[in-house]
Protein backbone atom coordinates (compact mmCIF):
# COMPACT_ATOMS: atom_id res chain seq x y z
CA UNK A 1 0.00 0.00 0.00
CA UNK A 2 1.39 3.44 -0.91
CA UNK A 3 2.33 5.85 1.82
CA UNK A 4 -0.29 8.54 1.23
CA UNK A 5 1.45 10.88 3.67
CA UNK A 6 4.52 10.92 1.38
CA UNK A 7 2.32 11.80 -1.59
CA UNK A 8 0.61 14.52 0.46
CA UNK A 9 3.96 15.89 1.62
CA UNK A 10 5.20 16.14 -1.95
CA UNK A 11 1.96 17.82 -3.07
CA UNK A 12 2.34 20.27 -0.19
CA UNK A 13 5.85 21.22 -1.30
CA UNK A 14 4.65 22.65 -4.61
CA UNK A 15 4.92 26.45 -4.87
CA UNK A 16 1.15 26.88 -5.25
CA UNK A 17 -0.37 24.41 -2.74
CA UNK A 18 -0.37 23.59 0.93
CA UNK A 19 -1.99 20.49 2.44
CA UNK A 20 -5.13 21.45 4.36
CA UNK A 21 -5.92 17.90 5.57
CA UNK A 22 -5.78 14.21 4.67
CA UNK A 23 -9.07 12.34 5.02
CA UNK A 24 -9.26 8.55 5.29
CA UNK A 25 -12.94 8.59 4.23
CA UNK A 26 -14.55 6.09 6.55
CA UNK A 27 -18.00 7.74 6.24
CA UNK A 28 -18.15 7.60 10.08
CA UNK A 29 -19.28 3.99 9.67
CA UNK A 30 -16.28 2.18 11.10
CA UNK A 31 -15.55 0.71 7.66
CA UNK A 32 -13.24 2.16 5.05
CA UNK A 33 -14.10 3.62 1.70
CA UNK A 34 -11.82 3.08 -1.21
CA UNK A 35 -10.19 6.51 -1.35
CA UNK A 36 -7.94 8.93 0.48
CA UNK A 37 -8.70 12.63 0.01
CA UNK A 38 -5.75 15.01 0.16
CA UNK A 39 -7.21 18.48 0.56
CA UNK A 40 -5.09 21.26 -0.89
CA UNK A 41 -5.46 24.97 -0.20
CA UNK A 42 -3.90 27.67 -2.33
CA UNK A 43 -0.62 28.67 -0.70
CA UNK A 44 -0.98 32.05 1.01
CA UNK A 45 -4.79 31.94 1.17
CA UNK A 46 -6.11 32.68 4.65
CA UNK A 47 -9.16 30.96 6.17
CA UNK A 48 -12.21 33.19 6.46
CA UNK A 49 -14.26 33.65 9.63
CA UNK A 50 -17.94 33.38 8.69
CA UNK A 51 -21.07 32.65 10.75
CA UNK A 52 -19.10 31.25 13.68
CA UNK A 53 -16.88 29.03 11.51
CA UNK A 54 -13.31 29.17 10.26
CA UNK A 55 -13.85 28.41 6.56
CA UNK A 56 -11.13 27.16 4.21
CA UNK A 57 -11.43 26.86 0.43
CA UNK A 58 -9.71 23.76 -0.91
CA UNK A 59 -9.48 21.36 -3.85
CA UNK A 60 -9.11 17.62 -3.27
CA UNK A 61 -6.80 15.12 -4.85
CA UNK A 62 -8.69 11.87 -4.33
CA UNK A 63 -6.57 8.72 -4.50
CA UNK A 64 -8.21 5.34 -5.11
CA UNK A 65 -7.16 2.55 -2.72
CA UNK A 66 -8.12 -0.29 -5.09
CA UNK A 67 -6.53 0.83 -8.38
CA UNK A 68 -3.74 3.21 -9.51
CA UNK A 69 -6.27 5.96 -10.14
CA UNK A 70 -6.66 9.50 -8.81
CA UNK A 71 -9.23 12.24 -9.36
CA UNK A 72 -9.10 16.03 -9.06
CA UNK A 73 -12.07 17.76 -7.45
CA UNK A 74 -13.31 21.35 -7.80
CA UNK A 75 -12.71 23.96 -5.14
CA UNK A 76 -15.18 23.71 -2.24
CA UNK A 77 -15.29 24.87 1.39
CA UNK A 78 -14.83 23.19 4.76
CA UNK A 79 -15.42 24.81 8.10
CA UNK A 80 -14.69 24.22 11.76
CA UNK A 81 -16.85 25.89 14.41
CA UNK A 82 -14.94 28.48 16.41
CA UNK A 83 -16.27 26.90 19.62
CA UNK A 84 -15.05 23.47 18.48
CA UNK A 85 -18.57 22.01 18.45
CA UNK A 86 -19.08 21.29 14.78
CA UNK A 87 -17.67 21.18 11.31
CA UNK A 88 -18.71 20.79 7.70
CA UNK A 89 -17.11 19.60 4.48
CA UNK A 90 -18.15 18.03 1.18
CA UNK A 91 -17.87 14.40 0.13
CA UNK A 92 -16.31 14.06 -3.36
CA UNK A 93 -18.92 13.34 -6.05
CA UNK A 94 -18.75 12.82 -9.83
CA UNK A 95 -20.23 16.26 -10.59
CA UNK A 96 -17.23 17.89 -8.86
CA UNK A 97 -14.55 16.29 -11.07
CA UNK A 98 -12.19 18.73 -12.79
CA UNK A 99 -9.22 18.32 -15.10
CA UNK A 100 -6.90 20.62 -13.10
CA UNK A 101 -6.62 22.42 -9.76
CA UNK A 102 -6.98 26.14 -10.63
CA UNK A 103 -3.86 27.36 -8.84
CA UNK A 104 -1.64 24.47 -10.08
CA UNK A 105 -0.45 26.59 -13.00
CA UNK A 106 2.71 24.52 -13.48
CA UNK A 107 0.74 21.25 -13.60
CA UNK A 108 2.84 19.72 -10.80
CA UNK A 109 -0.04 17.70 -9.31
CA UNK A 110 -0.43 15.32 -12.29
CA UNK A 111 3.36 14.94 -12.48
CA UNK A 112 3.63 14.02 -8.79
CA UNK A 113 0.78 11.51 -9.05
CA UNK A 114 2.34 9.95 -12.16
CA UNK A 115 5.63 9.54 -10.28
CA UNK A 116 3.72 7.37 -7.78
CA UNK A 117 2.07 5.38 -10.59
CA UNK A 118 -1.36 7.06 -10.53
CA UNK A 119 -3.33 8.08 -13.59
CA UNK A 120 -5.88 10.89 -13.27
CA UNK A 121 -9.48 9.97 -14.06
CA UNK A 122 -10.75 12.28 -16.82
CA UNK A 123 -13.93 14.11 -15.71
CA UNK A 124 -15.83 13.06 -18.84
CA UNK A 125 -15.09 9.38 -18.08
CA UNK A 126 -15.78 9.69 -14.35
CA UNK A 127 -19.21 11.21 -15.00
CA UNK A 128 -20.37 8.38 -17.29
CA UNK A 129 -23.32 6.46 -15.87
CA UNK A 130 -22.86 2.76 -15.20
CA UNK A 131 -25.42 0.38 -16.72
CA UNK A 132 -28.31 -0.32 -14.31
CA UNK A 133 -27.93 -3.64 -12.57
CA UNK A 134 -24.17 -3.83 -13.02
CA UNK A 135 -23.07 -6.13 -10.22
CA UNK A 136 -19.81 -6.09 -8.35
CA UNK A 137 -18.57 -8.79 -5.99
CA UNK A 138 -17.50 -7.25 -2.68
CA UNK A 139 -16.59 -8.46 0.76
CA UNK A 140 -20.00 -7.21 1.90
CA UNK A 141 -22.06 -9.54 -0.30
CA UNK A 142 -22.71 -13.26 -0.26
CA UNK A 143 -21.61 -15.44 -3.17
CA UNK A 144 -25.15 -15.35 -4.64
CA UNK A 145 -25.63 -11.58 -4.55
CA UNK A 146 -23.81 -8.54 -5.83
CA UNK A 147 -23.72 -4.86 -4.89
CA UNK A 148 -25.50 -3.05 -7.71
CA UNK A 149 -24.63 0.40 -8.98
CA UNK A 150 -28.05 1.62 -10.09
CA UNK A 151 -27.73 5.19 -11.36
CA UNK A 152 -24.12 5.51 -10.25
CA UNK A 153 -21.15 6.90 -12.16
CA UNK A 154 -17.78 5.42 -13.08
CA UNK A 155 -16.31 7.67 -10.36
CA UNK A 156 -18.60 6.09 -7.74
CA UNK A 157 -17.53 2.57 -8.67
CA UNK A 158 -13.85 3.33 -8.11
CA UNK A 159 -13.99 5.83 -5.26
CA UNK A 160 -17.12 5.06 -3.21
CA UNK A 161 -16.98 1.28 -3.13
CA UNK A 162 -16.93 0.13 0.49
CA UNK A 163 -14.10 -2.31 1.10
Describe each region flagged by the PLM.
Residues 1-126:
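Extended, charge-biased low-complexity segments
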